[in-house]
Design a protein with these regions (language model features):
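Bacterial N-terminal signal peptides that target proteins for export
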Residues: 1-11
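Bacterial N-terminal signal peptides
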Residues: 9-19
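Residues embedded in well-ordered secondary-structure elements
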Residues: 16, 80-82, 92-94, 107, ...
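Extracytoplasmic
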Residues: 28-201
Length: 875
């Protein structure tokens, strides 16, 4: 007999009721979430299109790093192409607004470069440009005047027409062409604002949100007992207490209140039609509605009397936050130490949310993308503390995960000292002159006064709080001792800073809300929570000023600061820290597809094998970043009509994989490369559900794992993590070929595997989610059949009332019922923001957040701003 499912989300109170009676066949027209575009990009009078990132790379064109030739090239790179005389490179660039422009071309010159013609839309605009030069360098700027351009992609052609008599040939027959950048200068020299979609409207007016079909009046106590006896007691009553849940004890309001978490479990299972199981007698819809109304009323009454939540445990900074905080406190030019947490590495800035526009192409490297890791901008001789573990179903910023042992405390003392004593510190630190250096002719007394003046604002920033006189005296006294001993102002200030970096007031985030009951955060605490939420770092001076005068406690000022901080490049921390953990992308690092079964996944560089997951991992993060920068709907994470991929990753999704038949050595690129925006028409692609990264990291070495994939979807997309599996699980074949040799599909074999009732209950929820992705093999490539020829069954049902035939229809159900994902995403983000697990007491706040987010169709900034204005965030 199936048991009561034991996994649930204590917060899914308001919207799961609308799941119960949805007629999936009568779906509303789907809302176009791509129309949501919030932050308006400023269209400046001059726009620079970088050759290596903003032009489509076609044919033999590629990005080339030019740092070995000097610092002349914009972005340290250019677009490189080669061909024989008569061949052309056809590419394009983006025009933001129609108008008349002057185009300024910056080309590269070199010994093996040819003579070019330039055409726009097939019309010659410049002829016989000789790019030969005895030395590698930049050509004189070339201006093409008074060109009328339409908005959108503009075609441009470079035709190789000949060569200088002194030019050398490239690879015996070809000549090269290099494009550093193209500048578009508007003739009227005006500032424009790009048009964006109107996102006004309300939840009630939107066709995108399903309405609850039935509402019921609450049952009386006797009616509730009779209903449960009729439909539930056979498995959960009296002696039959499967899942350790005896519903015969829940016949009174008092029991429902005192066992509120079990009450919530009951409610969720009934609302999602998980209970009663499909093979049991089902209550009529009207009865189910009245049961829910009864339990909802009890939960609502409980929440009225239990507004307070568990306090946030005082926690230390995790490794990523500590590096960011030191970087911003000391104004370092890069990171303090290597950070594997920063998946994407770049050598040019591309994340500019204030612009409202994400680049069409980005040159990036993965944190472990082979032999060319970008780690130059760190301090040598500085060793970080151990990586912080991610909490189960959560993030690595929770207090119960971030304690300080005596060994770790000692490492902080050593770490602070190693930072200021690093050989590169003076050149790496932007405040060396303004903070660590005194005038050469300053007397001892003047140095004492100067140090005290500099320490006051420094300590306020480091400790995120007002600096008491006693604290200032203590650090100034330590400076005086060091100055007497060393007679060096710079070294004495470094000694003080080393102490600050090891101070509990720097290392710990401490809030008054640690006391019992709800305690509103003071202005400094609120500034700290906000900055570590959005930036994973310290407040800046603007935010500190709002905390200092108390204005940050005003809702309009807090909202203004939130919007300002979202437009700061430091908000990229949300992608680097939140998105990476939310998507569980670290699991891809340890994914090991069988090298014999999937040789195309590996490339040997030297003595080491590198996995293609290095490229896969970048794709969902760039999608997330583009959503942030352009303030789009988070529903694009479910289904998007664009993505960012390298050429090799783009081929990975196709039927033919060019490098599949190459030998293992240097099979694919493991170094820095370009990820370009790709428009998608195949809805089997797009979003994070069907990203190769997701599909690969949730597979076994020899086959797919519908259980792991289903658990990932339940956890990440619905915030409904399944419980840990039983200690003893009957083995199942690790190789799908062994299963298929028995004439069975993986779905049929897993059904045999469910030998007891508890297995059935859990698998009934997660298996359909996993099998929806079964058309993708263990490395994320599409297949229509199993290798044996057996048909793949990707059908399923979501929450007992939303059938789907394949993964596209699963996406359609999620788009038709966006509150499912919007609630889960908001819960994940809120939990990350307040650094603790959510509780039932947070449900009213989540409902308020969801209402605002739904009204704005999931716009990213609305998620963030609603969380910051919520009760849990401010208390």
């Amino acid at each position: 007999m199936p048991t009561f499912p034991i996994f649930f989300n204590v917060l899914s109170v308001a919207f799961t009721a609308s799941l119960v009676f949805i007629d999936s066949a009568a779906a509303q027209p789907r809302f176009d979430y791509h129309s949501i575009r919030g932050r308006q990009p400023l269209l400046m009078a001059t726009k620079r299109c970088e050759g290596e990132t903003d032009f489509e790379l076609r044919g033999k064109s590629r990005a080339q790093d030019m740092r070995n030739f000097g610092a002349l090239w914009s972005g340290d790179a250019h677009l490189l192409w080669d061909g024989v005389v008569g061949e052309s490179l056809q590419t394009s660039f983006e025009v933001d607004a129609a108008g008349v422009y002057d185009l300024v071309l910056q080309l590269t010159i070199a010994p093996d470069y040819g003579i070019l013609d330039v055409m726009l839309d097939g019309t010659d605009v410049c002829q016989s440009i000789d790019t030969y030069n005895a030395q590698v360098g930049l050509a004189p700027l070339l201006t093409i005047s008074d060109v009328s351009l339409a908005v959108g992609r503009q075609a441009i052609t470079f035709k190789l027409t000949g060569s200088n008599v002194q030019a050398q040939k490239f690879q015996a027959s070809n000549y090269l062409m290099g494009l550093d950048y193209l500048e578009l200068k508007r003739k009227d020299n005006s500032l424009l604002v790009a048009p964006v979609a109107d996102i006004s409207g309300s939840l009630a007016d939107s066709d995108a949100f399903p309405q609850q079909a039935l509402k019921g009046a609450p049952l009386s106590t006797d009616e509730l007992t009779a209903t449960m006896k009729q439909f539930c007691f056979r498995c959960h009553g009296g002696e039959a207490t499967e899942a350790k849940l005896d519903l015969s004890l829940f016949g009174t309001r008092e029991t429902l209140l005192t066992r509120i978490e079990d009450t919530q479990r009951i409610r969720d299972a009934v609302a999602r039609r998980e209970m009663p199981p499909k093979d049991e007698r089902q209550p009529p819809d009207a009865v189910r509605a009245r049961m829910l109304a009864t339990v909802d009323a009890v939960i609502s009454d409980y929440l009225k009397d239990h507004r307070s939540h568990s306090p946030v445990v005082m926690r230390r900074l995790n490794r990523y936050e500590y590096s960011n905080a030191v970087r911003d406190l000391l104004q370092l030019r890069g990171d303090v130490y290597p950070l594997p947490e920063k998946t994407i590495r770049v050598d040019n800035l591309y994340f500019d949310p204030a612009s409202g526009r994400f680049p069409n192409a980005v040159r990036v490297s993965n944190r472990t993308m082979g032999k060319e890791q970008i780690e130059e901008k760190i301090l040598t001789s500085v060793s970080p503390f151990a990586i912080d573990l991610q909490a189960d179903g959560g993030f690595n910023n929770r207090g119960n995960q971030l304690s300080v042992s005596p060994i770790l405390l000692e490492s902080f003392l050593t770490l602070g000292r190693s930072i200021v004593d690093s050989p590169e510190f003076d050149a790496y630190c932007k405040i060396t002159d303004s903070f660590f250096t005194s005038p050469q002719d300053a007397t001892l007394e003047q140095q004492q006064i100067l140090a005290r003046m500099r320490l006051l604002p420094f300590l306020e920033l480091a400790f995120r709080s007002p600096v008491e006189e006693a604290v200032l005296n203590r650090y100034h006294g330590y400076f005086s001792q060091c100055l007497t001993k060393t007679n060096s102002f710079s070294q004495s200030m470094k000694d003080v800073v080393a102490g600050v970096l090891a101070s509990p007031r720097f290392i710990y985030i401490s809030e008054s809300a640690f006391e019992d009951g709800d305690v509103p955060l003071n202005a400094y605490e609120l500034a700290t929570r906000l900055s570590f939420f959005l930036w994973s770092s310290l407040p800046d001076e603007i935010l500190l000023a709002a905390a200092r005068d108390g204005s940050l406690l005003k809702p309009d000022v807090l909202d203004l600061q939130t919007r300002r901080m979202l437009e700061d490049p430091r908000s990229q921390a949300l992608a680097q820290n939140f998105a990476r953990q939310w998507l569980r992308l670290d699991q891809l690092v340890t994914a090991v597809p069988d090298i014999e079964r999937f040789p195309q996944y590996y490339s040997r560089i030297g003595c080491e094998q590198w996995g293609f997951g290095l490229q896969m991992m970048v794709e969902p993060l760039l999608l997330f970043e583009s959503m942030m920068v352009e303030d789009r709907s988070v529903m694009l994470l479910i289904d998007s009509n664009y993505t960012y991929r390298s050429d090799e990753l783009q081929a990975w999704y196709g039927a033919d994989l060019p490098f599949a038949d190459r030998e293992n050595r240097n099979r694919f690129n493991t170094e820095r490369q370009q990820f370009s925006k790709r428009l998608l028409t195949d809805r089997r692609q797009g979003g994070v559900l069907t990203a190769a990264a997701t599909l690969t990291m949730t597979s076994s070495p020899l086959r797919t794992s519908p259980i792991a994939r289903g658990a990932w979807v339940a956890t990440v997309i619905f915030n409904q993590p399944p419980p840990p599996p039983p200690d003893v699980i009957p083995p199942i074949e690790a190789d799908d070929k062994v299963i298929e040799a028995q004439g069975l599909t993986l779905r049929e074999r897993l059904k045999q595997h469910q030998v007891n009732a508890s297995c059935v209950a859990c698998h009934a929820k997660i298996d359909p989610l996993g099998f929806a992705l079964e058309n993708f093999d263990a490395i994320g490539r599409w297949r229509d059949h199993y290798s044996s020829g057996l048909e793949i069954d990707a059908t399923g049902e979501l929450f007992g009332s939303m059938p789907f035939q394949n993964v596209v229809e699963l996406k359609d159900q999620l788009l038709a019922h966006p509150e499912l994902f919007l609630r889960a995403f908001s819960e994940h983000m809120l939990s990350y923001a307040i650094a603790r697990k959510l509780e039932l007491e947070d449900a009213p706040a989540v409902d308020e957040i969801l209402s605002k987010v739904s009204t704005d169709h999931g716009q990213f900034s609305t998620v963030i701003r609603s969380i910051v204005q919520s009760h849990p965030f401010q208390n």
